[in-house]
Structure formats: C-alpha cells, structure tokens
C-alpha cells in the first residue's frame, strides 16, 4: 500500500486500531473500514482513481462488484475506465445478478475483490 493511500485511510479515520477477528478467523490489530473513507466523495474518487491506474493494463467490458459494500468502488472504477458497472445482490444466501443485469458470454470483467 502506498504511503499516500495509507495517509488517506488515517486522515478519514478509516484505519481502525484494536483487536479484530477477521472473516477468515485470523486476528488483526488493524482494520480498514472502507465505508468510513468512502463517505468522503472527493477522497473516494481519488482512491478509486489510484486503483483504476493499476487496472488500466487489463482489458475489460464491464466492472462488477457486490452490493452493498462494493457498489461505490465499482461505480467509481467503472466511471474512470469508461466502462459499464453492474453489481450483485444476495439471493438465497448467494450472490446473484438481479435487476435485469446480464453478462454476455465471453465478456471480460473486472471483479471487486470482495467476491470469494
């Protein structure tokens, strides 16, 4: 992580210190609460542009992200790349395309890292 990005997480209060049990079951002394950073639209745009610069090397047709946490990042990355952004929502406990979103066979996607 760049010093600039880390400074933005600290500036917005999005880098939390304490004891955290992660979804993986591992423990951490620090936690990045991205929602705290993303509430600052100017900073969110800046951070997503940093991410976009790393993604420009990849060919894609669309950007896809999970609701709810990934929508802002997906939208900003899609905007910066000039690509369509779609998102998934939980349906019966699994992520699914809803709201009429479709992915063409063979389409190249950039996926938000929350997908597992």
Indicate where each model-derived feature is located.
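PRPP-associated nucleotide enzymes
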Residues: 1-116
